[in-house]
């Protein structure tokens, strides 16, 4: 697998990775006035469903999706109201390409627990894939509004990418800038923010992010090519030559190398 494809796959997996972690005994209350559910409060059926879901999570993380799905079904047969099981079922269906079933599962998880930020994020990202951008934004905002949510950078990134796909460059820049503020070392954030800034004609800021990215081990054909395009727009021939040498040396068979050889800077 090429480094470019690995980067793209890592991006897609990263956007959902934190959502497949095993649920803990203590769970977020469904409303701000509800108390936290701790181990002593946990009914027997809920405990059994949680253990099944934890087992399913292990299978899911090993790539054994159908086995995980079977465990999830047993968890939900025990306790149909256990939101984390519905969220994990959505991830399993998503991996299997069952977009409609995945959407139904994420929606059920959010309905059961409106403060399940991971499920809201997943539903938002799936809606983005389905080009339902308005609903995607609703769910991203829901996730970001949950107090104590620890994956805000991931959601701001997804929201920014989704806004860019919808054609709202200003909103994309705002979300991606927030993602960068929270996670400045993330190469996917840097690349997508630079791409949006380039599209808006803000070449100096795009250059800043690409200098950091292309000077790191995370540089790939896409980031180098974008860097070349930025330097070309800024009239920096030395920068163009330097990045072009890197692209030809490190990614000689890439589509970006072919564009460089054609001088197709505006494709």
Where are these regions (language model features)?
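Terminal, low-structured helical/coil segments at or just beyond the last alpha-helical repeat
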Residues: 27-40, 215-267
């Amino acid at each position: 697998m090429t480094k470019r494809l690995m980067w793209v796959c890592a991006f897609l997996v990263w956007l959902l990775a934190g959502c497949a972690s095993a649920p803990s005994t203590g769970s977020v209350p469904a409303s701000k006035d509800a108390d936290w559910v701790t181990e002593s409060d946990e009914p027997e059926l809920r405990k059994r469903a949680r253990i099944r879901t934890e087992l399913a999570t292990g299978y899911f993380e090993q790539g054994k999706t159908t086995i995980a799905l079977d465990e999830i079904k047993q968890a939900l047969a025990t306790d149909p109201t256990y939101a984390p099981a519905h969220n994990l079922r959505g991830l399993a269906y998503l991996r299997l390409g069952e977009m409609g079933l995945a959407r139904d599962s994420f929606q059920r998880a959010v309905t059961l627990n409106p403060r399940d930020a991971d499920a809201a994020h997943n539903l938002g990202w799936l809606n983005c894939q389905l080009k339902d951008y308005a609903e995607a934004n609703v769910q991203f905002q829901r996730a970001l509004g949950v107090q104590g949510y620890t994956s805000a950078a991931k959601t701001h990134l997804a929201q920014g990418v989704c806004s860019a796909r919808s054609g709202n460059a200003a909103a994309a820049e705002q979300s991606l800038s927030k993602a960068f503020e929270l996670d400045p070392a993330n190469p996917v954030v840097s690349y997508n923010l630079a791409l949006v800034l380039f599209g808006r004609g803000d070449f100096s800021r795009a250059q800043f992010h690409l200098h950091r990215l292309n000077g790191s081990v995370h540089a790939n054909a896409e980031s180098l090519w974008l860097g070349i395009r930025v330097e070309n727009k800024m009239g920096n021939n030395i920068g163009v030559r330097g990045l072009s040498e890197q692209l030809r040396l490190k990614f000689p068979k890439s589509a970006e190398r072919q564009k460089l050889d054609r001088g197709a800077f505006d494709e």
